[in-house]
């Protein structure tokens, strides 16, 4: 039985795309979204915890995020964590509720975010190419062990290349869409 596993390669390439989507969800586009605060961790109870484990995050208006902190003693650490997350948000504390007005993006900030989109998508492309290399290495090993013929080797390599091309096209489409969203085009 050959060790080349197309399903495993597909799963790993899909994982790179999902990771990219997750990275993109943290980029601010000028509209309020709860996913904007996903990367925020709060130092409470002697540990770093995700924000959604110490508060309820919601979007009551298109340009406002509210964070309802469950424990009053955590309001200050949550405020500090959001301010230091580098998201350009300044919470307004109102009891146990933090209101985060979403400011308009400056042209400079939009360009920075567009650059980040490029970096994130390149990281995903590299991950996909590494998966392709692993697949091709496995195919070559299978051929050396005489588990597959020369024709099968070529067919499998073509399968891997088609899968790679399709996945990279998906990544490029996601990047173009996110860039347009950020630049407001």
UniProtKB/Swiss-Prot annotation:
Lineage at the top is:
Bacteria, Pseudomonadati, Pseudomonadota, Alphaproteobacteria, Sphingomonadales
**Corresponding gene?**
frr
Q: Does the keyword Protein biosynthesis apply?
A: yes
Task: Just give the chief location class.
Answer: cytoplasm
> Sorted alphabetically, which keywords does the UniProt record give?
Cytoplasm, Protein biosynthesis
| Molecular function per GO | ribosomal large subunit binding
Q: Where in the cell is it found?
A: Cytoplasm
Role: Responsible for the release of ribosomes from messenger RNA at the termination of protein biosynthesis. May increase the efficiency of translation by recycling ribosomes from one round of translation to another.
NCBIfam families, alphabetized: frr (TIGR00496)
Domain of life of the native organism: Bacteria
Q: Does the keyword Glycosyltransferase apply?
A: no
Q: Which organism is it from?
A: Zymomonas mobilis subsp. mobilis (strain ATCC 31821 / ZM4 / CP4)
Cellular component per GO, a single term: cytosol
What name does UniProt use for this protein?
Ribosome-recycling factor
Write out the similarity annotation: Belongs to the RRF family.
What SUPFAM superfamilies does its record include? Ribosome recycling factor, RRF
In the record, biological process GO terms are: cytoplasmic translational termination
